[in-house]
Amino acid sequence: MRTTRYCKCHFFNGESDHWGILDRTAFAQKGAKANFAPDTPILPKHLLLELNFDWEEEKVWGSTTYELLVYSNGVQEIKMDAANLEIDQVQVGSKRVSFENTGEKVIVFLPKPLKAGTAIKVKLNHSVSKPAAGIYFTKPDKEYPNRFKTVWTQGQDEDSKYYFPCFDQPNFKQTTEVKLHLPKGMFGLSNGRLLKKTSSASKSFYHYKLEIPYSTYLLSIVAGEFVEHKSKVGDIDIKWYVQKGREKEGRNSFKDTGKIMQFFSKYTGYAYPYKHYTQIAVPEFVFGGMENFTVTTQTDLTLHDDRARLDLDSNGLVAHEAAHMWFGDIVTAKDWSHAWLHESFATYFDALYTRESKGEEEFRYQLLEDAETYFSEDNRY
């Protein structure tokens, strides 16, 4: 994710107001507690998430089905993250089972203790109205009659639990399928490839699947009326989506995406592992950019018309989020105490693409700017 620039591990000869803080060991506030990855007696292998949406009530409801593998003997319960969700029913296999909903966790009680190596399937029916985080609705209203109607998610750090029960820590990875039931004519997007799309007199339906395991916070859902642009660079389909009428701005902002992906594949020696890379520019996306695996969400503020493009481009944001496909998505920190590595690598690779596209002087100037930005953090605490 990117809202501002982050640290890169480069230092420079010369004067700076901030060199005196190099002995600082952390920016942690007094009283901060140690953060550790959770125990893993059960690990998710596959997630099937099926959702419906009501814009008037700002309600999300549906079902979550997990295929799980037991890693410890004697497991009697499954604990999942579920913040302020209504849980209506839980099944293990075909049998309904009892559960406890604490408001932060849902604890599923198994019919009998399980042995290591056992595979089980758990399905939960759930709903939430006006979720506090994780998923956001926008729609026209009296004050803003032309406001864009959409819904979008933002999972980082641990906000997916606000709209479906899940294993909401970065060390848990699973393959996914996402099924979206939407109003007629509305476009739906999620991670991976589109398996099925149907439309009826009143509904649209989209079914996506991603076969590469990834962390829950990288799961994405966006729905609204968007226009697609598609091209091919090497073996990768490059796609981006914008609101109708902003296609030219989309080209201005995202036209170098294919070059960026090729450069990172070559530089890392590890080719981007999926068939496509998608970006979608979303109104009111206050998080800047979010590197959801295979399908990055970008703020529509990064879309530039021809006049604005004379003075700036979006390659910094595009490169930063694309770099996260390697550093954050494919390789992921075990827990959030190491998430700074995601951002540091992505910020550095953004600068590397600056050197590739604009030369050494621009590269070094960007490093200096980033170092100054990093050290200025000390003034905020």
Regions found by a protein language model. Give the residues of each.
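Acidic/His-enriched low-complexity segments
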Residues: 2-14, 19-275
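Hydrophobic alpha-helical and helix-loop surface patches within well-folded domains
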Residues: 208, 239-381
